[in-house]
C-alpha cells in the first residue's frame, strides 16, 4: 500500500524473506527507487493481510485512546525509536498500549496513523491509496496527539 498525499499506488512484496529483516530492507531500498519515480513517499509492508511496518519505519495506529503497533516478529526490525515509544506508552496512563496484529481493514477506522524511525522522527499519515485517515473532514485541523507526542519524544531522546 503506497503512502502519499497525491498519488494512488499499490505495491506487492512477494519475494521478501520472512526470516531476515535485513533482506526486507534491501528489498525496500530496491523498491524505493520505484516509489520515488512515482512520487510516493513510503510503502506499508503487508503480509497475509496484516500490517507489519513501512519500508522505512515502524507503524503506530490510534483508535481513540488505544495505541497499537505490530508485535515484533522475526521479519520486523526492532526500531530504537519504536522501543522508546513502547516503553513510554506502557507507563503512560492516558493510553492503552498494545502490541497486536493490525489488519489492512483496521487502518480504515484509525483515528491516527504515525510512522516512526530514529532518523526522521514521526510522520503523520494522511492518506493511504485513496483512503483519507480518518474519514473526517476536519482531520487536518484535528489535534494530532500521537504525532506531537512522538516528535517530542524524538527531540528529547534522539535528536
Task: Describe the predicted segments one by one.
Residues 1-159:
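Helix-start/capping segments and mature chain N-termini
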Amino acid at each position: 500500500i503506497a503512502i502519499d498525499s497525491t498519488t494512488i499506488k499499490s505495491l506487492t512484496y512477494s519475494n521478501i524473506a520472512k526470516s531476515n529483516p535485513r533482506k526486507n530492507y534491501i528489498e525496500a531500498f530496491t523498491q524505493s527507487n520505484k516509489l520515488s519515480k512515482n512520487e510516493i513517499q513510503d510503502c506499508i509492508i503487508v503480509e497475509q493481510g496484516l500490517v507489519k511496518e513501512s519500508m522505512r519505519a515502524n507503524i503506530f495506529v490510534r483508535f481513540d485512546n488505544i495505541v497499537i503497533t505490530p508485535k515484533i516478529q522475526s521479519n520486523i526490525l526492532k526500531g530504537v525509536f519504536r522501543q522508546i515509544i513502547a516503553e513510554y506508552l506502557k507507563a503512560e496512563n492516558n493510553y492503552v498500549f498494545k502490541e497486536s496484529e493490525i489488519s489492512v481493514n483496521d487502518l480504515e477506522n484509525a483515528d491516527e496513523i504515525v510512522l516512526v524511525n530514529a532518523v526522521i522522527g514521526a510522520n503523520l499519515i494522511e492518506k493511504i491509496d485513496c483512503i483519507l485517515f480518518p474519514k473526517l473532514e476536519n482531520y487536518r485541523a484535528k489535534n494530532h496527539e500521537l504525532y506531537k507526542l512522538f516528535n517530542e519524544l524524538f527531540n528529547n531522546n534522539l535528536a
